[in-house]
Amino acid sequence: MGKIIGIDLGTTNSCVAVLDGGKARVLENAEGDRTTPSIIAYTDDETIVGQPAKRQAVTNPNNTFFAIKRLIGRRFKDDEVQRDVNIMPFKIIQADNGDAWVESRGNKMAPPQVSAEILKKMKKTAEDFLGEEVTEAVITVPAYFNDSQRQATKDAGRIAGLEVKRIINEPTAAALAYGIDKKQGDNIVAVYDLGGGTFDISIIEIDSNDGDQTFEVLATNGDTHLGGEDFDNRLINYLADEFKKEQGLDLRKDPLAMQRLKEAAEKAKIELSSTNQTEVNLPYITADATGPKHLVVKITRAKLESLVEDLIIRTLEPLKVALADADLSVSDINEVILVGGQTRMPKVQEAVSNFFGKEPRKDVNPDEAVAVGAAIQAGVLSGDVKDVLLLDVTPLSLGIETMGSVMTKLIEKNTTIPTKAQQVFSTADDNQSAVTIHVLQGERKQASANKSLGQFNLDGIEPAPRGMPQIEVMFDIDADGILHVSATDKKTGKKQNITIKASSGLSEEEVAQMVRDAEAHAEEDKKFEELVQSRNQADGLVHATKKQVEEAGDALPADDKAKIEAAMSAVEVATKGNDKEAIEKATQELIEASAKLMEIAQAKAQTQGGAQEGAAKQSNATADDVVDAEFEEVKDDKK
């Protein structure tokens, strides 16, 4: 059985880890980095992922997608999506099913389809390290992701060619990474996870006793649309406003300028974590009739903190709710762990420290802990990690709509999963022959104020006065936090059941089509890679042959030289095209045309060998007797 890998599919950066010799190991990607920017770009002829995509974003802003995780499993009309529509340089559109999709070069794409490109890169990174195909993964999601967002993440995995063995909450994964080596005692840990696009707080009890470890999530809370991207946007807007005040031009109308501004804002934010002042200097950011314009703005740490103060305060309310749900006070928390790149900001650390009355731990890597935890969970599932029990919870209450548009809860938030719950309902009207089961997720009493997960009908109910039929509704949440619902007429035994797919979401056919598309692209990518290899080999051969022709000098007959030069020209022409077979044919013809060159080189090597042997035997030879040129040529030959 192949390895199950652990993937942190982040809003800003993603990371992959595997168990190696019993320890979780974070893997370096092809660029040599341990984290990969969650950025995908589409050009005329290829899809670019990670750092290369980030580098070309300034020149291709409309087709470079970032923070796609903020759209996954969401409806276009959601308030959070509408906020992003106005600030993202790329196009966010409404799909036929009401979901938020994106558009590039006329192609409409679902967020899981775009996210799958990042997962494919993570998969390839793991395969390069392991030397074998990878088909299974544990993927992390924010603890506060709802059912639709979890389903969409699983869809992304399938499109990338991965069977998602488990969806695990990010703070829980971080706690696993932190606690796996803590062998004794009972600790209550608060995991404060402020990433690129989402915020979570989880209160987790780690019980380590005689080699057995239990990680039990006591409560979780958060905000799935609050993170480092929002901090960046505050700074971007400030810079744009300052420029408008000074120059009278609104950079928000220029996607190219906004992409440069985004890069500069992110860089300035990072710098202000270690310095008190920085300067954003962007020459030629735009131009008008009077000529080019430059943006130069000094920003202090205090200014940045004032711009984002309310965002930091927003993270504190979920902390209070999570503690109350766990029936704990601040003094009950033994350790505080910070996860997510945005927690590197000193003001965030200060706010967390003040809230809990203790300094957060500094021995957990905020960028890698989640992927490490995912790899450990993968090890638990494969049997490589023993004596670890993980008890996670459902973040939001689940129920159905009942009479008067009320949400009746069947499973309360923070219930340990997997779990089941059932309740008997009845009809609202006399002789009602069918009921609609409308499944909801959320904490509000009013049904319409909660997230609709989907609905289905149970028909064939025998005519009876209202309140008489007995309809048993069962909710079953699996270990991924995904809901399965059934409704049974207790009298007739008629049953209807579904795995909740969001009222939006991708259909099975759409996912299957996207999987096929991804497989087709994989074949294209393989062919492209083989073409590049053939080109490189051909270029290398031409370079080496030119050098040998020069070294052979007059020893190479004129007709052989003409043949070789013609063959080299043919290779150079072939490498400019995209026909791999033509390149390989021209390369082979050059090898054959160079046969005489090889003979000359071998003869020369033998002559040089003899000369050296003779020189060694001359006991009275002086240094001047040694022919330097011959030694130099031997060195070159060895190269």
Swiss-Prot record:
Keyword field contains Ribosomal protein: no
Residue ranges, compositional bias (Acidic residues): 625-639
Pfam hit, one: HSP70
Keywords in alphabetical order: ATP-binding, Chaperone, Nucleotide-binding, Phosphoprotein, Stress response
GO molecular function, one term: ATP binding
Region (Disordered): 603-639
Record PTM Phosphothreonine, positions in chain: T198
Low complexity: compositionally biased ranges: 603-618
Induction or repression: By stress conditions e.g. heat shock.
Gene3D superfamilies linked: 1.20.1270.10, 3.30.420.40, Actin, Chain A, domain 4 (3.90.640.10), Substrate Binding Domain Of DNAk, Chain A, domain 1 (2.60.34.10)
Family membership: Belongs to the heat shock protein 70 family.
HAMAP family to which the protein is assigned, alphabetical: DnaK
Biological role: Acts as a chaperone.
Name of the protein described by the UniProt record: Chaperone protein DnaK
Gene source species: Shewanella sp. (strain MR-7)
Lineage: Bacteria, Pseudomonadati, Pseudomonadota, Gammaproteobacteria, Alteromonadales
Gene expressing this chain: dnaK
